[in-house]
Every structure is written in C-alpha cells, then in structure tokens.
C-alpha cells in the first residue's frame, strides 16, 4: 500500500514522521494508534491498516527517533520512554485527537503505551500490550543484548548485519524460508532505521529508568480495558508479561472489581506476531476492539 508520510516538528526541534489513515465513509471514526518495535518503522504495519479501516477504525502510526523519517536528538543517550511518550502526546495534539479508541503497541511500542497511560490517563481507551520486556537488562540483572548490536552497526557502518540479527530473533528460519517476499519487505523497511536511530532507541531500552513494573497499576487506572498478546516462541516473555498483566489488572480493578484482562499466546509466532502470525493477530485484536 502507498503510504503518504507527514512530518511534525516537535518542541525539541526533532521531527516525528507519522501517518493518519482515515475511514473515507466515516470522518469521525474512532482512532487506533499503532506503536512499533525497535527497528520496525511504521510501514511494517502496512498489512494491518486496511483490516482496521475496514472495521471502521482510523489508524495513526508514527516512527520512533531515527526510524523512517523521524530525526534523532543531538545526544543519542538522552532518549527515554518518557520522552517518546511526550512525543506521542504532541502528535495527538497536532492531529486534534483527544482520545484514542485503542493503543496497540509491540515491544518498545508496548512499553511506550504503558508509560503513556500512566503519565497521561484517560486518553487511551483500550491498551493492547504485545511482546514487551518489563525493564532494562540492567534492572533485570541479565546480559545487555543491545550493546553488541550497536557495536556491530558502528563497526560496519551499516544496519545490514544488525537487521539480519534482529530478523533471526523475530522469525524462525522455517518461516523466512516459506515467506521470502514478506521477509524481504520487512528487511527493507528495517533498513530505513539509521544507526543513530537504533542507538538512541536502544538507550531508552537500556536506561536505568526503564522499568514498567511500578507503572503497570497506574497505567491500568487510566484506561478502560487491556489485552496482552505474546508470541509463543518469543523467549521468556510470556512469564514476564504475566507480571505486567497482573499490575494493569489491579489498576483496572479499582474501577471495576470484575474486570478481566485477556492474555493471548499466539501459536508459532515470534516477537512481531502481526507479521509472522498475521491472521491470528488481526482476529484477536479486532475481536477485542469491537468489545
């Protein structure tokens, strides 16, 4: 699909690229915001957007710093999830969107959604949290998976090797072999991420300030409903996301003691299940959006 990208200059003087896709027959359609993974510019959602608009939802997408046509800060180490959430708030103001029907976030886009909901309550209706870690590697006491990829990109002067490494984390070799055209499409989109963009977004993921666990309950207080989605093959994320789900549910329960927060495991899917398990993913989200 052809994607006409708009550019907004933020108060920080950075540029955020974005696309708002309307429903032609429904000028006041509820808006679904799609928020991306690291190294996954907004065009990775191209197959999902027509499905959502056919269901009567306008769709807003944006690129994180250094992804697509979004620019980076002068200090690459300065990016945090708080800052990215503020960027999205500016974007919503610019597009005159006072409330989004749903925020669907994958990986760091899901983390941004939780931070946004905690910081700006009652703007997100439904929050869909997909395939996210709950805190930085430092906070988790594990190895820093991001630093080697940054060093690889800097050493080679290209995102080629790093993009391939990430592709192989996202998708199984069997899936890539069976879907060469889609693998090629995704890889080409990934390569529109600059090395600076990759490093500055990794800074948010590596930051000592990145910890969703104390924010989950507050995020739940500021939304109307939530759904958690994780790919079956995405490492140990199902376990970590259950903890986040419980926190969000505690917040939602303050408004409705009988509230339920769904937790869907997408079979045979990896980190970006809207790509490698498209049919299952859109079935799950459209059912939730209609509720």
Predicted regions and their residues:
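Active-site loop/oxyanion-hole signature of alpha/beta-hydrolase fold enzymes
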Residues: 13-14, 46-50, 54, 58-104, ...
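Conserved alpha/beta-hydrolase catalytic His-Asp/Glu region
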Residues: 138-144, 156-220
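Alpha/beta-hydrolase fold catalytic core
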Residues: 1-33, 54-57, 259-262, 290-291
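Catalytic histidine-centered segment of alpha/beta-hydrolase-like enzymes
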Residues: 236, 263-283
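Flexible "cap/lid" loop of the alpha/beta hydrolase fold
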Residues: 114-156
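Conserved serine/cysteine hydrolase catalytic core
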Residues: 195-256
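The serine-hydrolase catalytic nucleophile loop
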Residues: 37-49
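Active-site glycine-rich loops that stabilize anionic/oxyanionic intermediates
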Residues: 29, 37-40, 107
């Amino acid at each position: 699909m052809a994607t006409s990208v708009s550019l907004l200059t933020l108060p920080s003087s950075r540029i955020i690229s974005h696309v708002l896709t309307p429903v032609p027959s429904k000028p006041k359609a509820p808006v679904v915001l799609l928020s991306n993974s690291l190294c996954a510019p907004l065009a990775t959602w191209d197959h999902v957007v027509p499905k959502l608009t056919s269901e009567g939802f306008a769709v807003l997408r944006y690129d994180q710093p250094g992804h697509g046509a979004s620019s980076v800060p002068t200090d690459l180490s300065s990016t945090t999830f708080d800052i990215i959430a503020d960027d999205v708030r500016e974007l919503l103001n610019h597009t005159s969107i006072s409330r989004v029907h749903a925020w669907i976030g994958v990986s760091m886009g899901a983390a941004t959604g939780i931070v946004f909901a905690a910081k700006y309550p009652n703007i997100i209706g439904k929050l869909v949290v997909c395939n996210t870690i709950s805190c930085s590697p430092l906070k988790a006491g594990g190895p820093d998976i991001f630093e080697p990829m940054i060093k690889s990109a800097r050493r080679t002067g290209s995102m080629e090797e790093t993009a391939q490494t990430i592709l192989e984390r996202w998708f199984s070799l069997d899936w890539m072999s069976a879907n060469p055209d889609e693998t090629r499409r995704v890889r080409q989109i990934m390569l529109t991420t600059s090395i600076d963009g990759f490093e500055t977004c990794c800074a948010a993921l590596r930051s000592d300030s990145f910890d969703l666990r104390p924010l989950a309950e507050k995020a739940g207080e500021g939304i109307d409903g939530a759904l958690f989605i994780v790919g079956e093959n995405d490492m140990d994320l199902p376990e970590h996301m259950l903890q986040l789900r419980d926190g969000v549910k505690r917040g939602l329960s303050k408004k409705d003691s009988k509230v339920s927060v769904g937790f869907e495991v997408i079979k045979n899917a990896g980190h970006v299940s809207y790509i490698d398990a498209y049919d299952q993913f859109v079935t799950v989200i459209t059912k939730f959006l209609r509720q």
